[in-house]
Amino acid sequence: MDTFDAIYQRRSVKHFDPDHRLTAEEERKLHEAAIQAPTSFNIQLWRFLIIRDPQLRQTIREKYGNQAQMTDASLLILVAADVNAWDKDPARYWRNAPREVANYLVGAIASFYGGKPQLQRDEAQRSIGMAMQNLMLAAKAMGYDSCPMIGFDLQKVAELVKLPADYAIGPMVAIGKRTEDAPGKRRSNSPGRIPLGKLLCLTKVWCLAI
């Protein structure tokens, strides 16, 4: 599928076939696509929890979100990020670079992130978002649909899955075969989309009022 087709056809689907399963190769392809997303200094701080256990998925649905896709989608992925990945053996992120380049960048990582917890958290969420978009567009290109979800108790779910304390929790992503059509998007100003002209600022200083 053409990249632009995947972008415009991707919708947040709520209803999935609970009996459909992805093959191991399809899952691998999705995960490989997700980790091609860019990260600052190539830190690759995203982490993906594949929630397979039916009872765990049912518990999450019943107690912390009540969204059908939590149990019905073929895949339920909790996307998180290691906030301290910048300080965990950073040389590995540049192991294939020339030594001079690697030494410089490893030092720059420490200088850029050290002692800046807010920046570290912000970077975690930025990285989560870019990986999620890769994941959802890859799913669309493979003929599947997806739904990003934030409508759940983040703290309770983090505790339930024993997420490490130094990880930032992000949205969940449901992926699978849809059973109902979602409203379409057009390449023009589709219903609900703010017109492009109100989102672009073409002057030297900020000019947007909305």
Swiss-Prot record:
Keyword annotations of the record: Flavoprotein, FMN, Herbicide resistance, NAD, NADP, Oxidoreductase
A Pfam family that the UniProt record links to this protein: Nitroreductase
Cofactor or coenzyme needed: FMN
GO molecular function, one term: oxidoreductase activity
GO process annotations (BP): response to herbicide
CDD domains: MhqN-like
Keyword Acetylation: no
Free-text function comment from the UniProt entry: Controls resistance to the herbicide Dinoseb and metronidazole. Involved in detoxification of Dinoseb via the reduction of the nitro group(s) and this process is accompanied by the formation of toxic superoxide anions.
Protein family (similarity comment): Belongs to the nitroreductase family.
Protein name, as recorded: Protein DrgA
Organism expressing this protein natively: Synechocystis sp. (strain ATCC 27184 / PCC 6803 / Kazusa)
